[in-house]
Every structure is written in C-alpha cells, then in structure tokens.
Amino acid sequence: MSGNNFNASNADTDHLPQVSILAQYIKDLSFENPNAPAVYQWQTQPHIEVQFNIGTQPMAQDVYEVALKVDVSAKADEGVVFHVELVYNGLFAIKNVPADQIQPFLYIEAPRILFPFVRRILADSVRDGNFPPLMLEPIDFAALYMQQTEQQDMLSNTEPAGQA
C-alpha cells in the first residue's frame, strides 16, 4: 500500500462553511400537575394547546444560542390537567457561512436538530406525571420561517412613510 495522505490541510478547509453543535441543554423545565390526585379520576378528554417559539442570540464571535420554547397546557371541563414549560437550548458555532444564510440556519436547521430532544423531554415529563406521553407532531421549520419572513415583509411594506 502506498503512503498517500488523504487528509486535507487546515489551509484547504479554513474557507469552507463549518457548523458544529457545541452544547445542548435544558435551560428551564417545569411540569405542573395542580389537580393531582383528583385529575386521575376525571372522565373528560383534555384539550391540549401547544405554543412554540424560537429565540436566538449571539454569544461570541461565530457562536449563537438557539432556544426552543414550548408551552403545553392540557385542560378538561373539570380544570387544568397539566402544564409543561420547556426551554431547550443549543449552542452552535457557525464559521464561513454567508451572512444571508446565518438567520435561516438559526431558525430552520438548528431547531430541526434540537426538536427530537425537545419532543422526547416533553413526552417523558408528561409520562412521568402519570399521563400518556405527549408526542408532538413534526414541525416544518422551513415553512414557519418563510411564513414569518413574509409577514415581516408585509408589515414593513405597509408602514407609513416618514415625513420630510
């Protein structure tokens, strides 16, 4: 076998786009079961409401924090069944990525990477509260991002012009 070296030098890869996950962590988790143990005798099916939010902030040069915030409320005719709040964060290093592609990464790809962990944590928390696991449906982060940017574009186009 010949002694060919297939490793790329640092000079060859320094200009290529690089994205890496530095850390993932629960920043805040709260499970409330305010009507236990009576809630386990209730016969009505609860109505479940899920609210979802994505937040980002720069932490250092080329490092961004992405936060997935999920608020789940389950209510029945008799009262609150359970309430879960989760803030799950990821730290991402983004290097040599064009500026116009950073925001789409932070609002589409980063949440897509974090979502399976959020889903599992919520399912486990609800199950540990003695309820059937809550399995969130997959979320199309690209569609949400496009919808949000379209709404922002429409708002910026309808704002009255400044006075001269």
UniProtKB/Swiss-Prot annotation:
Highest rank taxon of the organism: Bacteria
Question: Does the record's keyword annotation contain Amino-acid biosynthesis?
Answer: no
Q: Which InterPro entries match?
A: SecB, SecB-like_sf
Q: What is its main location?
A: cytoplasm
- Family annotation (Pfam families): SecB
What's a BP term from Gene Ontology annotated to this protein?
Answer: protein tetramerization
Provide this UniProt record's keywords sorted from A to Z: Chaperone, Cytoplasm, Protein transport, Translocation, Transport
Q: Spell out the disulfide connections.
A: none
Q: Which NCBIfam families match?
A: PRK05751.1-3, secB
Query: What PANTHER family is this protein classified in?
Result: PROTEIN-EXPORT PROTEIN SECB, PTHR36918
Q: Which family does it belong to?
A: Belongs to the SecB family.
Role: One of the proteins required for the normal export of preproteins out of the cell cytoplasm. It is a molecular chaperone that binds to a subset of precursor proteins, maintaining them in a translocation-competent state. It also specifically binds to its receptor SecA.
Assembly, per entry: Homotetramer, a dimer of dimers. One homotetramer interacts with 1 SecA dimer.
Q: What is this protein called?
A: Protein-export protein SecB
Protein source organism: Zymomonas mobilis subsp. mobilis (strain ATCC 31821 / ZM4 / CP4)
